[in-house]
């Protein structure tokens, strides 16, 4: 094991430790792809304060990343019959919890919706459509098949010992531009959050399949 391997392993395990403690991880994708950093949480540990953080510090578009099996079980059809998005992000129709919410917009309501969707006994009727939470279906092959935030969030949740479902939101600057580079670094240091890239996770999984 060389020094680079040690550093990579430390970064991955720091991210998993944060997720186990209910804290978000900052995950960046490739500079020649979206070149954005997302706050990612394991859906099982989501709390109202962490949802509020995502809404406050992110784009406001909070997504629930699911396996194909869970999306099929909940009968979540694609948002569009033909996916024309640049990177093939597999959005389904937006959702809301059928019970326990008001307008569905608040941090508490969105947390309730996500908890309803990931409950072990969740059924299609537990959700209404459309809503204010945006499910995305991860590829079955994870980051080995598609190097996206969606797949990374599901992989990280699974590796941390939770159900394979993640919550994410893109980090945004107060002026409405996307956080990148040093801005992301400053945010991570200010909030003491670990950082990881999708590429690093894919490399680690290739060497240490889990």
Curated annotation (Swiss-Prot):
Residues the record lists as binding D-ribulose 5-phosphate: 33-34, 38, 146-150, 170
Note on cofactor: Binds 2 divalent metal cations per subunit. Magnesium or manganese.
Cofactor(s) recorded in Swiss-Prot or TrEMBL: Mg(2+); Mn(2+)
UniProt pathway: Cofactor biosynthesis; riboflavin biosynthesis; 2-hydroxy-3-oxobutyl phosphate from D-ribulose 5-phosphate: step 1/1
Keywords: Lyase, Magnesium, Manganese, Metal-binding, Riboflavin biosynthesis
Domain of life: Bacteria
Stored Pfam families: DHBP_synthase
Record's catalysed reaction(s): D-ribulose 5-phosphate = (2S)-2-hydroxy-3-oxobutyl phosphate + formate + H(+)
Residues given in the record as Mg(2+) 2 binding sites: 34, 149
Keyword Metal-binding assigned: yes
Manganese recorded as keyword: yes
GO biological process, one term: riboflavin biosynthetic process
GO CC, one annotated term: cytosol
InterPro entries: DHBP_synth_RibB-like_a/b_dom, DHBP_synthase_RibB
UniProt binding sites for Mg(2+) 1: 34
Annotated positions for site Essential for catalytic activity: 132, 170
EC number: 4.1.99.12
A molecular function GO annotation: magnesium ion binding
SUPFAM superfamilies: YrdC/RibB
Record function comment: Catalyzes the conversion of D-ribulose 5-phosphate to formate and 3,4-dihydroxy-2-butanone 4-phosphate.
Subunit structure and binding partners: Homodimer.
Family named by the database record: Belongs to the DHBP synthase family.
Name of the molecule in the record: 3,4-dihydroxy-2-butanone 4-phosphate synthase
Species assigned in the record: Chromobacterium violaceum (strain ATCC 12472 / DSM 30191 / JCM 1249 / CCUG 213 / NBRC 12614 / NCIMB 9131 / NCTC 9757 / MK)
């Amino acid at each position: 094991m060389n020094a680079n391997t040690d550093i990579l392993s430390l970064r991955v395990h720091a991210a998993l430790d944060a997720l186990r403690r209910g804290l978000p991880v900052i995950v960046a994708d490739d500079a020649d792809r979206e070149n954005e950093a997302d706050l990612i949480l394991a859906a099982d540990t989501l709390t109202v304060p962490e949802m509020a953080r995502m809404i406050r510090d992110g784009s406001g578009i909070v997504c629930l990343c699911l396996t194909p099996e869970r999306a099929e079980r909940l009968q979540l059809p694609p948002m569009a019959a033909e996916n024309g998005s640049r990177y093939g992000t597999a959005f389904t129709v937006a959702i809301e919890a059928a019970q326990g919410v008001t307008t569905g917009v608040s941090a508490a309501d969105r947390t309730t919706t996500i908890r309803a969707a990931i409950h072990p006994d969740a059924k299609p009727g537990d959700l209404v459509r459309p809503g204010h939470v945006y499910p995305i279906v991860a590829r079955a092959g994870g980051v080995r098949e598609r190097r996206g935030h969606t797949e990374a969030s599901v992989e990280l949740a699974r590796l941390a010992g939770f159900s394979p479902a993640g919550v994410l939101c893109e980090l945004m600057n107060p002026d409405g531009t996307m956080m990148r580079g040093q801005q992301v670094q400053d945010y991570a240091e200010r909030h003491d959050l670990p950082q990881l890239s999708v590429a690093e996770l894919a490399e680690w999984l290739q060497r240490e399949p889990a």
